[in-house]
Design a protein with these regions (language model features):
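Membrane-proximal, glycine/serine-rich, low-complexity loop/turn segments characteristic
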Residues: 10-11, 15-16, 39-271, 290-322, ...
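Outer membrane beta-barrel strand-and-loop segments of large Gram-negative receptors
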Residues: 352-356, 397-399, 403-404, 503, ...
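Periplasm-facing N-terminal accessory domains of Gram-negative outer-membrane beta-barrel systems
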Residues: 1-33, 74
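Conserved "repeat-terminator" motif of extracellular CCP/Sushi domains
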Residues: 19-30, 38-40, 140-145, 596
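Face-selective signature of the C-terminal outer-membrane beta-barrel domain
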Residues: 240-264, 288-439, 464, 468, ...
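C-terminal extracellular loops and terminal segments
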Residues: 119, 560-564, 581-653
């Protein structure tokens, strides 16, 4: 055909554009091969993407460990935080699953990172995504080969943690775990031929861990002082198998079917001694054994139809999940006058079904996407307390509880892009009907629930200052619904004198977010900067309180009124030479919690008042990537977290350094690596909490230092 010039803006936001019909004049001649090449950006204004293989210092560990080196991400108490908040929605391959939690975050510290290809961070999600998670979304993408034929990867890593004692035990209790082993074999297989692609992934992560070694000093207004230690030796074995197939039924239709089965076995052996203020008298020794088995099974089926117009697609997906938690606790309560034996058994079965329909229509200057989603979630929980002689368990607080939620939703999202302007505007409307039915004989709580129909808009306006500079303005509204464990009515006794209890009267937390971001690129680097402000209504948090005549502390979830988070984030990347690249991430923010008053119902009604709290916090993360001759690569990461605000108190500063080295062997098919986390063993978690007539300071000397070695081979 004769050449024809038709100017248009390709942009970066849409893979396909509708340019209409372009009429060409025929002119038969041979054409040379046309090659389109390019490299995907890792840091974009709307999404940050990170390959797990580049995270050398955390290779062979868990997904949680792999994520703590990423810009804007911190970890605390086994959860991810984005910009200081743990209200994060975690997806696997774009979907919520019981493996990582539907409402909160679970098991991230036990899922092997060896099965993961990349991790995506979205701070301001569009209406296409579910509305929960005010801090943003983390999408974990499993590995899937795209080469034809049979190929795969095998790997084996091992390590040791708790190499030396951070702090000695109080006298008279069992030893801490030391020299804790970590073993992670992994296998990935893929066969692609013609219209069929088959895939299989299997991983096993076995670890022993000094999971908790917390020393708490409690001070009461009446002059009493209690010193305690909570030491938890944990043994975990987490196994997963994922398999499936992609079938190209025709040139326009693809069917994908996959399933995942996982088991997580946890054994916790704990000791909790309680002393007077001078440590001259042991008042009590609480020992426990937790035997827990978690079983997860998921099934996914998806149909994708490609219309004749390129990029116009219809996707229909069905996801079903079953997740069982089978917990057995055994307690020994050693008092000066007697020894008591207690136990309980908890069985929780989670059933979730999701159906979604998504449609994408390319436009000349962008695209339109819309869809519907329906979720049904049902969780019956049975708690059976078995009190012994002189029992301290609240046996009347057991029984059945049934959690049920129904969520239909629909959304529309419009994307426009020209040579200077980008617009993304969307609206998601969700209806939620949640009920929580409890045992009618429960001494404190009654059945509860809520329902609402709410809009969740999102807006992004961007101006391209130049080819290397873009300015973006964001707004979105999101919700964090209480998870089932947040409203669970059964007291938890893994800490005998700081008891955690849920609250069925909890209501959703709503967040409005405003952000102004800028990205400036140059030849060998870039600067990403943003200023953000979040306003939270009905903030969900735990409130610590006491009741008259008792030194026991009850941690109960409550809606604590309004809170605010205002901050600035910077990500600077610079390739300083052919062998070294440095990334510096700085995140500073101010947390404010307004004054509030709550009424705790458990174990008896009591009122708690808190004054306004205000604290400036943040974190600094320096990451160096080094490329040496003979296929040798290295990584060094240093992380500092400033003191941070929590309702009723604060957490203190923390610091750690991680490092790793890997070498390619066997003509690039093999790889050896060695790494170490928290090299200097400096990481401690220290908190201060103030209540109505008490305060306590806790410092956790849990295991953070681990050395690993491993080998991977591709075929």
């Amino acid at each position: 055909y004769e050449p024809k010039i038709e100017p248009f803006d390709a942009g970066q936001l849409s893979a396909f554009l509708d340019l209409g019909n372009i009429m060409l004049t025929q002119n038969a001649r041979s054409l040379n091969t046309v090659t389109v090449s390019g490299k995907q950006e890792d840091i974009r204004m709307d999404k940050k993407t990170f390959n797990v293989a580049d995270n050398i210092s955390q290779a062979g560990g868990s997904v949680l460990e792999a994520m703590k080196n990423l810009p804007g991400v911190t970890t605390q108490d086994g959860k991810i935080q984005l910009r200081g908040s743990d209200k994060v929605m975690v997806l696997i391959d774009g979907r919520q699953t019981a493996l990582t939690g539907f409402g909160g975050q679970t098991s991230l510290d036990n899922i092997p990172a060896s099965a993961i290809e990349r991790i995506e961070i979205i701070n301001n999600p569009s209406s296409k995504y579910d509305a929960n998670g005010n801090a943003g979304i983390i999408n974990i993408i499993y590995k899937k080969e795209k080469q034809d034929g049979f190929n795969g990867k095998i790997g084996l890593s091992g390590g040791l943690g708790a190499l030396w004692v951070k702090r000695e035990n109080y006298p008279g209790i069992r030893s801490q775990y030391q020299g804790t082993p970590k073993i992670n074999p992994s296998l990935s297989l893929n066969y692609r031929k013609n219209k069929i692609n088959l895939f299989l992934q299997a991983d096993d992560l076995y670890t022993k861990t000094l999971n908790k070694n917390e020393f708490v000093d409690r001070f009461y207004d009446n002059g009493d002082t209690v010193k305690q230690q909570t030491k938890r030796n944990r043994t975990t074995n987490f196994s997963t198998v994922k398999a499936g197939l992609d079938w190209s039924v025709s040139s326009s239709d693809i069917i994908t079917v996959s399933g995942l089965f996982g088991t997580e076995k946890i054994l916790d052996r704990g000791d909790e001694p309680f002393f007077n203020g001078s440590l001259s008298e042991r008042q009590r020794l609480w020992q426990f054994l937790e035997d827990e088995l978690k079983t997860t099974a998921t099934f996914s089926a998806a149909w994708q139809h490609h219309f004749k117009q390129p990029g116009r697609t219809l996707n229909v997906g069905l996801n079903a999940t079953f997740h069982r938690e089978d917990e057995k606790y055994f307690f020994t309560n050693i008092m000066p006058e007697y020894t008591g034996l207690d136990s309980f058994k908890l069985l929780s079965d989670e059933h979730v079904t999701d159906l979604n329909i998504d449609y994408v229509q390319p436009l000349k200057h962008g695209r339109f996407e819309g869809g519907v989603k329906f979720r049904y979630r049902y969780i019956p929980v049975n708690m059976d307390f078995k009190p012994g002689i002189h029992s301290v368990l609240d046996a009347n607080a057991g029984g059945m509880a049934k959690y049920k939620e129904v969520i239909p939703a629909l959304y529309g999202n419009y994307v426009y892009e020209s040579n200077k302007i980008e617009i993304e505007a969307g609206l998601r409307i969700e209806y939620v009907d949640l009920s929580y039915n409890v045992n009618p004989g429960h001494p404190t709580y009654k059945s509860d629930g809520y329902h609402y129909t709410q809009p969740f808009p999102n807006l992004r306006l961007a101006y391209k200052v130049s080819a290397n500079n873009k300015l973006s303005l964001y707004y979105n509204r999101r919700v964090d619904r209480p998870n089932e464990v947040d409203i669970r009515i059964f007291p938890k006794y893994d800490d005998a004198e700081i008891i955690k209890v849920g609250n069925p009267a909890l209501r959703p937390q709503y967040t409005n977010t405003f952000e102004l971001g800028d990205k400036t690129s140059w030849d060998k680097g870039f600067l990403f900067s943003s200023v953000y402000h979040k306003r939270m209504d009905a903030t969900i948090t735990r409130i610590a309180s006491t009741i008259p005549g008792s030194t026991l502390i009850y941690n109960i979830f409550q809606n604590a009124g309004k809170s605010y988070n205002t901050g600035i984030e910077l990500v600077i990347s610079q390739k300083v030479s052919n062998w070294a690249t440095f990334n510096l991430n700085l995140n500073g923010y101010q947390n404010i919690v307004d004054s509030f008053t709550v009424v705790n119902q458990y174990p008896v009604e009591n009122v708690f008042n808190a004054a306004r709290q205000d604290l400036i916090s943040g974190n600094i993360k320096l990451n160096g990537q080094f490329h040496f001759p003979k296929q040798v690569e290295a990584q060094l990461t240093a992380i500092y977290q400033a003191p941070d605000l929590v309702p009723q108190g604060k957490t203190f500063s923390r610091f750690s350094v991680d490092a790793g080295v890997k070498k390619g062997i066997q003509q690039g098919k093999g790889e050896l690596f060695v790494n170490a986390t928290d090299i200097a063993n400096t990481l401690r978690i220290k908190r201060e909490v103030r209540g109505k007539d008490f305060r306590y300071i806790s410092t956790d000397y849990n295991e953070t230092q681990v050395i690993r070695v491993g080998y991977n081979y591709k075929f």
